[in-house]
């Protein structure tokens, strides 16, 4: 199943190793809007574009930081367990279904509405005790230059959940995923 980085790995397997892959399933559907549809957008597509615009302008700083200066954030996070916790829990607040409107406007949300305190502390501890914040940030730096949007022909399942960061309409997804068997 591919969500977040799992989506990138899943799509790489489905696109580059189709002879050894029976199919893929992603819930972060990565692709590009079809320019030919821009004059005939559905209401959902307009909402998807607005959400992506909001994400790029207001919620993408972590990604830019890690993709361009991974060591800086890596040293900062390796220096403070509280800093490490804040960095991660802030993402849980923004990216879990814990009381947000799509687009990030908080309506009293708290991550514990979606995850237990223990689950969040387990995640923070995994990064802190292994001192892996910098290497995790470098994944962005190493990977962004090699991302592709090549076609995928293996059978593909796509799940769209209400507050996913990335959303495509089916017609846009079909530009990349050529054999969608579940939507």
Feature map (PLM): residue ranges:
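C-terminal subdomain of alpha/beta-hydrolase-fold enzymes, centered on the catalytic histidine
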Residues: 66-183
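Detector for Asparagine
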Residues: 16-19, 27, 60, 131, ...
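Short, surface-exposed, polar/charged, turn-prone segments marking secondary-structure boundaries
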Residues: 28-29, 50-55, 104-105
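Acidic-enriched, low-complexity/disordered segments with a strong bias for Aspartate over Glutamate
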Residues: 4, 34, 40-43, 59, ...
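Conserved hydrolase catalytic core segment
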Residues: 1-49
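The feature captures the conserved acid-bearing segment of alpha/beta-hydrolase catalytic domains
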Residues: 39-70, 150-151
């Amino acid at each position: 199943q591919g969500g977040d980085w799992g989506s990138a790995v899943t799509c790489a397997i489905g696109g580059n190793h189709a002879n050894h892959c029976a199919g893929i399933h992603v819930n972060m559907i990565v692709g590009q809007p079809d320019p030919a549809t821009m004059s005939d957008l559905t209401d959902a597509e307009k909402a998807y574009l607005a959400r992506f615009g909001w994400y790029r302008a207001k919620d993408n700083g972590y990604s830019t930081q890690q993709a361009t200066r991974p060591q800086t954030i890596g040293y900062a996070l390796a220096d403070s367990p509280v800093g490490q916790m804040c960095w991660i829990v802030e993402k849980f607040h923004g990216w879990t279904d814990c009381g947000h409107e799509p687009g990030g406007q908080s309506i009293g949300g708290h991550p514990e509405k979606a995850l237990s305190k223990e689950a969040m502390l387990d995640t923070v501890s995994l990064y802190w005790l292994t001192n892996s914040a910098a290497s995790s940030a470098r994944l962005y730096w190493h990977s962004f230059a090699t991302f592709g949007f090549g076609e995928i022909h293996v059978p593909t399942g796509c799940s769209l959940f209400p507050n996913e960061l990335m959303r495509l309409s089916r017609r846009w997804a079909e530009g990349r995923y050529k054999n969608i068997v579940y939507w």
